[in-house]
């Protein structure tokens, strides 16, 4: 129990293994590198969004505008390519727009002190409206093969974009756990006042979280355009909720200061894995949100129960030394049960 709570991403990993085992038992052909590669390819967009959402949530904030940012940046790379710009320039253009969108969210939250949920609900509509105004509501089609080729498998079923996603996961996880600036995210989310007293650049850290979140949303938009080959006018709609759900499933606390990027990665992979269940059982696509929501609620309820049990255990250990006959404090003797008072 204590291991699961200290390593929150472990629960997501165990859930992935359990679901994978069930699927293999139902269909042995599911056990293959091709299947894993397919699931990973399908999860890349959600993984990128979960990484960004995790950074924001670690600082005790939330961003519900990333779906619109994905659409806006996918439009940006598509329009730039169709206007004759090279692929690197087009991708940098999309990344710049994502960074600006994220920084604007950060300015509203950090600079103007607007609650994050309110500020990003506003920019959710703002960025979606900017996307539709830019294109006149039309789809962006005819994207060049140079962009589409980035999603084609090259090694072990993994595409160049997939390798870039894995690199971002690893470098992000290392940065958060091994560097001072990475640990600042945890300090800000855990105790804002204490972080200020310790000299942490609180406002800069929160601004950085929102800005990186916007850039990762831009990366997700590039991956979307590459995988699909065109950009519909509703690109990214609803992805913000899935990103938050993936983080929660992976052990990122909504109260800030707890979780890892590996957990966010595993949560996104697990949610994508649920889609394969629908295909295997030939269920309609609209079951996806229902099943994902059901799983999320189950994880939250289980996590809450485990936390309560651990809290009771720690409280018993704390006060056990005050009980007669327990000098060392190691042996926990339960307190006598109180009789229920009659009203």
From Swiss-Prot:
Entry similarity comment: Belongs to the binding-protein-dependent transport system permease family. AraH/RbsC subfamily.
Name of this chain's protein: Autoinducer 2 import system permease protein LsrC
Domain of life from the UniProt record: Bacteria
Annotated compartments: Cell inner membrane
GO CC, alphabetical: plasma membrane
Protein's UniProt keywords contain Zinc-finger: no
Keywords: Cell inner membrane, Cell membrane, Membrane, Transmembrane, Transmembrane helix, Transport
Keyword Membrane attached: yes
Membrane-crossing residue ranges in chain numbering: 13-33, 38-58, 61-81, 92-112, 114-134, 154-174, 212-232, 251-271, 283-303
Annotated GO MF terms: transmembrane transporter activity
Gene that this polypeptide is encoded by: lsrC
PANTHER family, per the entry: ABC TRANSPORTER PERMEASE PROTEIN YPHD-RELATED-RELATED, AUTOINDUCER 2 IMPORT SYSTEM PERMEASE PROTEIN LSRC
Region called Disordered, residue ranges: 321-343
Organism in which the protein naturally occurs: Enterobacter sp. (strain 638)
Quaternary structure, from the entry: The complex is composed of two ATP-binding proteins (LsrA), two transmembrane proteins (LsrC and LsrD) and a solute-binding protein (LsrB).
Parts forming coiled coils: none
Entry membrane topology: Multi-pass membrane protein
Record function comment: Part of the ABC transporter complex LsrABCD involved in autoinducer 2 (AI-2) import. Probably responsible for the translocation of the substrate across the membrane.
């Amino acid at each position: 129990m204590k291991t699961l709570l200290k390593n929150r991403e472990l629960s997501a990993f165990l859930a992935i293994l359990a679901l994978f085992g069930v699927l293999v038992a139902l269909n042995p052909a599911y056990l293959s590198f091709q299947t894993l590669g397919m699931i990973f390819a399908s999860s890349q967009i959600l993984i990128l969004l979960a990484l960004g959402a995790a950074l924001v949530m670690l600082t005790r904030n939330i961003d519900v505008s990333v779906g619109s940012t994905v659409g806006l940046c996918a439009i940006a790379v598509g329009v730039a390519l169709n206007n004759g710009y090279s692929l690197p320039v087009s991708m940098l253009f999309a990344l710049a727009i994502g960074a600006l969108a994220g920084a604007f969210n950060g300015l509203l939250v950090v600079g103007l002190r607007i609650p994050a949920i309110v500020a990003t609900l506003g920019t959710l509509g703002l960025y979606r409206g900017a996307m539709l105004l830019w294109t006149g509501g039309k789809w962006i089609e005819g994207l060049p093969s140079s962009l589409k080729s980035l999603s084609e498998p090259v090694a072990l079923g993994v595409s160049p974009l997939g390798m870039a996603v894995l690199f971002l996961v690893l470098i992000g996880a290392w940065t958060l756990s091994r560097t001072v600036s990475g640990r600042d995210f945890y300090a800000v989310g855990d105790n804002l006042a204490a972080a200020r007293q310790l000299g942490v650049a609180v406002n800069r850290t929160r601004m950085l979280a929102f800005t990186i979140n916007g850039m990762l949303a831009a990366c997700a938009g590039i991956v979307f355009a590459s995988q699909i080959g065109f950009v519909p006018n509703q690109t990214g709609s609803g992805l913000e909720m899935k990103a938050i759900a993936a983080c929660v499933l992976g052990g990122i606390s909504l109260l800030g200061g707890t979780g890892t990027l590996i957990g966010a990665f595993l949560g996104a992979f697990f949610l994508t894995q649920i889609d394969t269940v629908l295909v295997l059982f030939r269920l309609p696509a609209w079951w996806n949100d229902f099943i994902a929501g059901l799983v999320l609620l189950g994880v939250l309820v289980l996590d809450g129960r485990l936390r309560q049990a651990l809290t009771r255990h720690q409280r018993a250990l704390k006060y056990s030394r005050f009980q007669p006959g327990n000098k060392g404090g190691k042996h926990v003797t339960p307190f006598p049960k109180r009789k229920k008072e009659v009203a």
